Amino acid sequence: MTQVSNRETPRGVAVLSRFLASESAGGIVLMAAALAALIVANSSLSASYFSILHSVWLGLSVELWINDGLMAIFFLMVGLEIKREVLAGGLATWGQRALPGFAAAGGMLVPALIYIAINWGNPQTLSGWAIPAATDIAFALGVLSLLGNRVPTSLKVFLAALAILDDLGAVTIIAFFYSSGLNLPMLAAAFATLAVLIALNRLNVRRLLPYLLLGALLWFFVLQSGVHATLAGVALALCIPMGKPEEEARSPLLFLEEKMHYWVAFAVVPIFGFANAGVSLSGITLANLIDPVPMGVALGLFVGKQIGVFLAAVLAIRAGLATLPENSNWVQLYGVAILCGIGFTMSLFIGNLAFPGSQHLIDEVKVGVLIGSGLAAIAGILLLRTRFSRH
């Protein structure tokens, strides 16, 4: 992928520009939220912090409302981005999908294999194999934004496209590997609601209200069905009509995406980060850091991501299946591959799904994610800053 598609219309270009800007700024806010959570969790306020998260409201803990409710809005945003990019954006043609597609596949496979190798023989911890397989688009773009305008737009678009495809892979993994104890009547109700949403799309209903009301109903049914509730957000997004290029001024999808971006970037994701990054470091020793879970997560993110993304990209380019992003070189591409190891939001999210009955393992996941993502952010920014300072 070398540039934004020529098929993309002016409003689509504006949406992409705002997307990159808000995701970058949102990533910085997310960093602050994560740091604040770490400080609070290791201060005199820690008891209040964890007490609030575990307090129950309307049958669910505050933590579950955030992870199952607010994150459904995040996944709605992810679904809207995927649909826009595939229909009229940077993933509109197979040629544009090739490089981020191969890179995303490699960047999911290698980290998972590293985690599996380190946790082999332990069925309980092996279920966390998907934790290091995701890239946090907000965090990664936020770190990349620290270099300012020195970074070619093509590299930013490549990273955004890769992370979007990465999210699509993560959604698929959650659907197939982290859903259990299915409630068939509720699942049938969810499919019936989804069928109505699809019918609205086919009938070219362009008012958002019916979609949003049915989407809320879909979320409830999916929550009760045993399938993870956040998938309702993705399903709803795929049903909201994009419209033809000449109708983009009235596109429900673009309108909703524009309205949601800042709320997701500056509220939903930081709240999730603050609620999930807090881990008490008391009692954690160097010996704990080499336990299979934190070691597998940290090495999967920091080592596995850069190897998987860069190797897959090199093979695709050398085979003539893709081209190097415009105005970039191999070292810069490698720097971006390192940044793909920032897996904060989705990695923490999958960690909660992988170990629902063990706070100890969830805390180990948090430590591994913080170390792996931190190393990836530092190494990536140092390499890219050194490289760009020479030009």
Curated annotation (Swiss-Prot):
It is found in: Cell inner membrane. The chain crosses the membrane at residues 19-39, 56-76, 98-118, 128-148, 157-177, 180-200, 208-228, 264-284, 297-317, 335-355, 364-384. GO terms for molecular function: sodium:proton antiporter activity. One of its GO terms (biological process) is regulation of pH. Its main location: membrane. InterPro entries: Na/H_antiporter_dom_sf, NhaA. It is a multi-pass membrane protein. Keywords: Antiport, Cell inner membrane, Cell membrane, Ion transport, Membrane, Sodium, Sodium transport, Transmembrane, Transmembrane helix, Transport. The keyword Cell inner membrane applies. Gene3D superfamilies: Na+/H+ antiporter like domain. GO terms for cellular component: plasma membrane. It catalyses: Na(+)(in) + 2 H(+)(out) = Na(+)(out) + 2 H(+)(in). The keyword Transport applies. Na(+)/H(+) antiporter that extrudes sodium in exchange for external protons. Belongs to the NhaA Na(+)/H(+) (TC 2.A.33) antiporter family. NCBIfam families: NhaA, PRK09560.1, PRK09561.1. This is Na(+)/H(+) antiporter NhaA 1. It comes from Pseudomonas savastanoi pv. phaseolicola (strain 1448A / Race 6) (Pseudomonas syringae pv. phaseolicola (strain 1448A / Race 6)).
